[in-house]
Regions:
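Chalcogenol-based redox active-site neighborhoods
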Residues: 1-166, 172
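Cysteine/selenocysteine-centered motifs that mediate thiol-based redox chemistry or coordinate metal-sulfur cofactors
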Residues: 161-188
Length: 188
């Protein structure tokens, strides 16, 4: 097993690439599925990674706080389930039900979406602002500055980015280093 580094050249202010992925609810989703929203919080995450598990409740809180404001979470699992069986579609469905996910949890089964975004870790967040028929990247990176303990967070990068967009302002910190487990790729 070799871990693929970022192959994408997705930068801030770029148009996000579209996708067509199946969610744990059996529905197929693309960026067009969320055309009515002002922005999207795309989170590459998974079941098995301890970092992703530490952030799971915070991801749920982001959706609870921002979905009503037009900024929902979309979670995408990029790992190959043959390498990490805990990240199989069936286990994703079980996890989504157990944790009461309020957002779509999608499988990047062919592993062709995460490289286009340049995701390298789980979790890795991309905040996309909807500008007509385009979703423009406004933030890339970590959820916050403390994966170990939510009560010790000093910088809430994603919340700060979304709050700035909601206020019509520039995102204060546009990019941070994603902290998490490397994405497990079947071709590397």
């Amino acid at each position: 097993m070799v871990l693929r580094e970022s192959e994408g050249n997705l930068d801030l202010d770029d148009e996000a690439p579209d996708f067509s992925l199946v969610g744990t609810d059996g529905e197929t989703y693309s960026l067009d599925s969320f055309a009515e929203y002002d922005a999207l919080l795309v989170v590459f995450t998974c079941n098995h990674c301890p970092y992703a598990q530490k952030y799971e409740k915070r991801i749920l809180e982001l959706d609870k706080k921002y979905d009503p404001k037009g900024y929902p979470v979309i979670a995408i699992s990029p790992n190959d389930p043959e390498i990490v069986p805990e990240d199989s579609f069936e286990n994703m469905q079980k996890r989504a039900e157990k944790m009461n996910y309020t957002f779509p949890y999608l499988l990047d089964e062919k592993q062709n979406v995460y490289p286009k975004y340049g995701a390298t870790k789980t979790p890795h967040v991309f905040v996309l602002e909807n500008e007509g028929d385009e979703h423009i990247v406004r933030y890339i990176g970590a959820i916050d500055d403390n994966y170990k303990d939510a009560s010790l967070v000093e910088e809430k990068y994603v919340e700060n980015a979304v709050d700035a967009l909601l206020a019509g302002n520039e995102v204060p910190v546009k990019e941070t280093k994603a902290i998490g487990c490397s994405i497990k790729d079947k071709d590397k």
